[in-house]
Amino acid sequence: MKFAVIVFPGSNCDRDVVTVTRGLLDQPTRLVWHTEDDLDGCDVAVIPGGFSYGDYLRCGAIARFSPVMQAVRRHAERGGLVIGICNGFQVLTEAGLLPGALVRNRDLQFVCDRVALKVERTDLPWVHSYRPGEVITLPIAHGEGCYYAEEATLAELEENRQVVFRYCRPDGTIDAVGNPNGSLHNIAGLCNRHGNVLGMMPHPERASDPILGGSDGRRLFESLVASALAVV
């Protein structure tokens, strides 16, 4: 499986993703600068975390206009896989590839922590390696990670089963106590209707090696590779 990791000015998690896809999983991976407009040959486009363009105006608001985002859009429209992590999730919402928006955290403070997530779906290429309802632990690091959408959009997300991960307590209880940033419906990650575009605020690439305290995130990347092998 071939990965393309998008790099904007201000991205700072691109190398972390490459360490997982190329270093740990031995998958072909290339870094794609924001001025490029061609993703031909890649299977998965990754928009990593960081502070694209310094988060000026709004997180992801400038990055959405980069030439590479036109290539990402074409890739998604062809059914190609796209994942946005943290700032990448913000970019995807700004670009209209995912509904809703990421706004200031409930307490108006930057949150850096390890949080529990409940896996809501396991029928997508991203999550085959998880069990339905499984509680996993991933790191978060964001100041604007509170997911917001109008009630009609939230209802559609629930009806179409587009919520992939929810913040929860370690025992799986979904409530305000287990919600680190005030996201509506405790949404930590969601997909488009087709399931090929995924956005999530937690960082799976930072939980891909036991030496760093956990490997729950690695299974997301392993799911992708396994899905590709199953097709072959």
Swiss-Prot record:
CDD domains: GATase1_FGAR_AT. The lineage of its organism: Bacteria, Bacillati, Cyanobacteriota, Cyanophyceae, Gloeobacterales. Its EC number is 6.3.5.3, 3.5.1.2. Gene3D superfamilies: 3.40.50.880. InterPro entries: Class_I_gatase-like, PRibForGlyAmidine_synth_PurQ. Coiled coil: none annotated. It catalyses: N(2)-formyl-N(1)-(5-phospho-beta-D-ribosyl)glycinamide + L-glutamine + ATP + H2O = 2-formamido-N(1)-(5-O-phospho-beta-D-ribosyl)acetamidine + L-glutamate + ADP + phosphate + H(+); L-glutamine + H2O = L-glutamate + NH4(+). Part of the phosphoribosylformylglycinamidine synthase complex involved in the purines biosynthetic pathway. Catalyzes the ATP-dependent conversion of formylglycinamide ribonucleotide (FGAR) and glutamine to yield formylglycinamidine ribonucleotide (FGAM) and glutamate. The FGAM synthase complex is composed of three subunits. PurQ produces an ammonia molecule by converting glutamine to glutamate. PurL transfers the ammonia molecule to FGAR to form FGAM in an ATP-dependent manner. Keywords: ATP-binding, Cytoplasm, Glutamine amidotransferase, Hydrolase, Ligase, Nucleotide-binding, Purine biosynthesis. GO terms for molecular function: ATP binding; glutaminase activity; phosphoribosylformylglycinamidine synthase activity. GO terms for cellular component: cytoplasm. Residues 3-232 form the Glutamine amidotransferase type-1 domain. Pathway: Purine metabolism; IMP biosynthesis via de novo pathway; 5-amino-1-(5-phospho-D-ribosyl)imidazole from N(2)-formyl-N(1)-(5-phospho-D-ribosyl)glycinamide: step 1/2. GO terms for biological process: 'de novo' IMP biosynthetic process. This is Phosphoribosylformylglycinamidine synthase subunit PurQ. Part of the FGAM synthase complex composed of 1 PurL, 1 PurQ and 2 PurS subunits. It is found in: Cytoplasm. The active site is at C86, H203, E205.
